[in-house]
Amino acid sequence: YFEENDFYERCLKKEKSIFLIKDSKINHKGNSSVKNIFKDEIEINRNWHLMWSTFYFYEKHFGKITAYKKVLPKLFSAFLKMLFFIIINNKKKRKIYSARLSGIFNSITGNKSWFRPNITKL
């Protein structure tokens, strides 16, 4: 989720030029190719990888302190939201915020980006 940012930072460090096309337009249709039965699982996957990538990117380019500053508010927010959705029994949202927590913890502890969606169901 931070591929463009990572590429940008690496170019800056190597003093390479970056070109911006100001009038470019991209028509991105989100997860329009994903079957409806997989949408929830893909959303969980997206949230896990977003949080994992956040810590990984900031640690790689700016160090652990900056990475912690970026993810600690997200960690506390995800934890509180997960508790809230447990209390009100919203399983879908609980899974999303559990995935966010898992992504952050896995990145902080140095684990590789291992999470994959469970899309084997028919």
Regions found by a protein language model. Give the residues of each.
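Active-site-adjacent helix/loop segment of glycosyltransferases
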Residues: Y8-E9, K13, S17-K92
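Terminal low-complexity segments of carbohydrate-biosynthetic enzymes
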Residues: W52-S53, K74-L122
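Conserved glycosyltransferase catalytic-site signature
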Residues: Y1-F7
